[in-house]
């Protein structure tokens, strides 16, 4: 953002919501924003080049995360990713008959809360646990909400509005103890 010489440059503190790209990421992405923009699902030469680059990126991300490339799904952003994770896990569990319970907090990103609202209308059990006055998940309330039918627990690592950092190690321990089959989404 350009600023007149006599004005202070603003300091943007909401890095939990968006963060400037690292120079290496800009360099790796720029060719696909400025020229090599083929549809990776197509069959022509430009599309095949885009698909090769996409699959190469998938392998790099998979290696960094210690998973297989087939486990890496790229989305357009956080909202789409939250919807996919929460709804996908819930519907997969229901189709496998492993449970129908979803646990989240009242302090989650709206993409998670709206996904939970939709799933609740579709017959899933949704528990929305409280947070402390400091914005930290109430671990006792979380523990009470977990049971053997819980299939996904969603607790955001860092709140994008006030910056509280959740105790995910403690959350994960509770999930392992009380709902061992549940996925932890953050």
Locations of regions flagged by a protein language model:
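Pyridoxal 5′-phosphate
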Residues: 1-186
């Amino acid at each position: 953002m350009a600023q007149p010489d006599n004005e202070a440059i603003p300091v943007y503190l909401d890095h939990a919501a968006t963060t400037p790209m690292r120079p290496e990421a800009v360099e790796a992405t720029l060719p696909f924003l400025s020229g090599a923009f083929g549809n990776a699902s197509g069959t022509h030469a430009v599309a095949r080049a885009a698909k090769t680059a996409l699959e190469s990126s998938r392998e790099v991300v998979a290696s960094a995360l210690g998973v297989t490339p087939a486990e890496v799904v790229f989305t357009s952003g956080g909202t789409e990713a939250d919807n996919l994770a929460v709804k996908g896990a819930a519907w997969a569990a229901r189709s496998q008959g492993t449970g129908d319970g979803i646990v989240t907090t009242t302090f989650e990103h709206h993409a998670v809360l709206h996904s939970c609202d939709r799933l609740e209308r579709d017959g899933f059990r949704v528990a929305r646990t409280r947070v402390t006055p400091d914005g930290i998940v109430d671990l006792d309330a979380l523990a009470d909400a977990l049971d053997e039918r819980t299939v996904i627990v969603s607790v955001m690592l860092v709140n994008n509005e006030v910056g509280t950092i959740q105790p995910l190690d403690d959350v994960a321990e509770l999930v392992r103890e009380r709902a061992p089959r549940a996925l932890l989404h953050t």
